[in-house]
Amino acid sequence: MQFKTIVAAFATVAAVQAANVSTNGSNRTNGSNTTSTKISTGAAASNALGAGVFGAAVAAGVAFLF
């Protein structure tokens, strides 16, 4: 049981870090773009974060199957 918890926690951390990297990349481009691009890029960053959370949930579910 402890091994499953460790695997699930590691998968969650990895997914969150991946989401943070994609969000940070979008924020870096926001500094030099126009306001209209910031809005669309913000939506893309929000979608990336949502995908990261969903990926973490899937990874945790798969880890508990084993």
Curated annotation (Swiss-Prot):
Cell location: Cell membrane
Q: Does the keyword Isomerase apply?
A: no
List UniProt keywords, sorted A-Z. Answer: Cell membrane, Glycoprotein, GPI-anchor, Lipoprotein, Membrane, Signal
Q: Does the keyword Signal apply?
A: yes
- The residues forming the signal peptide are 1-18
Q: What is the predominant subcellular site recorded for this chain?
A: membrane
Q: How does it sit in the membrane?
A: Lipid-anchor; GPI-anchor
| Prodomain positions | 43-66
Q: Which residues are glycosylated?
A: 20, 24, 27, 30, 33
Lipid attachment, kind GPI-anchor amidated glycine:
42
GO cellular component: a single term: endoplasmic reticulum
Residue ranges the record marks as coiled coil: none
* Protein name per its UniProtKB record: Uncharacterized protein YDR524C-B
Please report the organism this UniProt entry assigns to the protein.
Saccharomyces cerevisiae (strain ATCC 204508 / S288c) (Baker's yeast)
